[in-house]
Amino acid sequence: MGELPIAPVDRLIRKAGAERVSEEAAKILAEYLEEYAIEVSKKAVEFARHAGRKTVKAEDIKLAIKS
């Protein structure tokens, strides 16, 4: 874990209306977002392979999000 930088996650929380964000809150959200992104990516890879491709395309990501 730890691939996502905390600063952009902090900005997302502030964009949602928070005036202040604890470092722990930003870290927890970053961990969740990273886990979610990995799960979506795994599904997208499966869709690409099923289509006979090695390259994951935007359509694979979109399908993975919907599934």
Swiss-Prot record:
Residues 20-22, 54-57 are annotated as: Interaction with DNA. It comes from the Archaea. GO terms for molecular function: DNA binding; protein heterodimerization activity. CDD domains: HFD_archaea_histone-like. One of its GO terms (cellular component) is cytoplasm. Gene3D superfamilies: Histone, subunit A. It holds the Pfam family CBFD_NFYB_HMF. Homodimer or heterodimer with another histone. Dimers then assemble into higher oligomers, with the DNA wrapped around the protein core. This is Archaeal histone A. It comes from Pyrococcus sp. (strain GB-3a). The lineage of its organism: Archaea, Methanobacteriati, Methanobacteriota, Thermococci, Thermococcales.
